[in-house]
């Protein structure tokens, strides 16, 4: 006999992951997605898990917070991360994907699962209390549902502004000017690099600052606050002459062999560019390239004019221009438990960026936890929290304020949080060396999750997702 059906609203990264976890545990799922009936300011397709900003999931190495989070998700057979691994493109030490193949594969896998029923319509309200429901509508939740969520929580939503970088055709780049390299020669030479001298950099910065901005809606103009990890490039430029050079345009660790001996200090200081614009592959063939760190709210005509001032991009043809959009998130510390259940309704979950986690892997982590817990609830069992020692657990603890990390004052100023070693509990023994400390965090996480997985397996039948994938 099948368990009671669970409703998942939103087929982004979190919703797709949640639906997969539920279905693989034997729980039927109704997955509701409003696209293509209604789109958003940032989406371009109707595929599930469309990546609207970067195509990167962050650092691969588990001695980085993003890498440890990915490792934990692989351990629990995350649909999102396993699919990302399958459609990865070269990106140095990061996990980046061919976004078209990635989202198409997610859609196909979920569409072909016998326990997943897909419905394409706009969900206008929160379903009745009879339904186990996961809200995974993301930062671009449609207005009608957003208002219903505000009515339910009694709290106005929070928001910030996010932006996406332009994508250009690889064959429109001047290959005589750009060079292939990864920073510090880490991994394959995954990036194309556009070097700039000081004069060109100064001129480029001035044009960025003076460039005409796209119009914001009236309600957006009232509070155009940005998320620091995804600032528009023109906003970074305004912060100081050298701010871009120590951010997305830094030249440190990048070297073109044509410039001569890297280890000749005099030559290195003479030849090293003042700044470098990096281009990252969007697909394996390199036909499409993303301008790394070039999120922007410039008008499209201004993007074409100004970005063609970059050496090597004088004749660049744009597949997609950068855009800025308003992202909504819940004031989660006042609303959610570490299980991702709403405090005031145990069979209603929230997952993904709407909860205030930042980053693709973090969204998948929320979907994974919400899916597991909705499955447990459907089976009449008690939802679980991930171990504090894990990156998944630490993120969920932060957004739910489990360990009182946020003071009452800061709870009123809750802002999205990416994976960070600053969230995990301190080690019992202080380790000064950062690399060794991060390695210890990783080892502690692995041990805690092994114990947690064994206990979780006992809650499910032998065919549960943790032991046998559909």
Curated annotation (Swiss-Prot):
One Gene Ontology term from the biological process aspect of the record: tRNA methylation
Q: Which cofactor does it need?
A: FAD
Q: Which PROSITE patterns does this UniProt record tie to the protein?
A: GIDA_2
One GO cellular component term noted in the UniProt record for this chain: cytosol
List the keywords (alphabetical): Cytoplasm, FAD, Flavoprotein, Methyltransferase, NAD, NADP, Transferase, tRNA processing
Name the EC number(s). 2.1.1.74
Catalyzed reactions: uridine(54) in tRNA + (6R)-5,10-methylene-5,6,7,8-tetrahydrofolate + NADH + H(+) = 5-methyluridine(54) in tRNA + (6S)-5,6,7,8-tetrahydrofolate + NAD(+); uridine(54) in tRNA + (6R)-5,10-methylene-5,6,7,8-tetrahydrofolate + NADPH + H(+) = 5-methyluridine(54) in tRNA + (6S)-5,6,7,8-tetrahydrofolate + NADP(+)
Positions the record marks as coiled coil are: none
Location(s) in or outside the cell: Cytoplasm
User: Which Pfam families is this protein grouped with?
Assistant: GIDA
Q: List the SUPFAM superfamilies.
A: FAD/NAD(P)-binding domain
User: Which sites bind FAD?
Assistant: 10-15
State a single Gene Ontology molecular function.
Answer: flavin adenine dinucleotide binding
Family assignment?
Answer: Belongs to the MnmG family. TrmFO subfamily.
The protein's job, in short, is: Catalyzes the folate-dependent formation of 5-methyl-uridine at position 54 (M-5-U54) in all tRNAs.
UniProt name for this protein: Methylenetetrahydrofolate--tRNA-(uracil-5-)-methyltransferase TrmFO
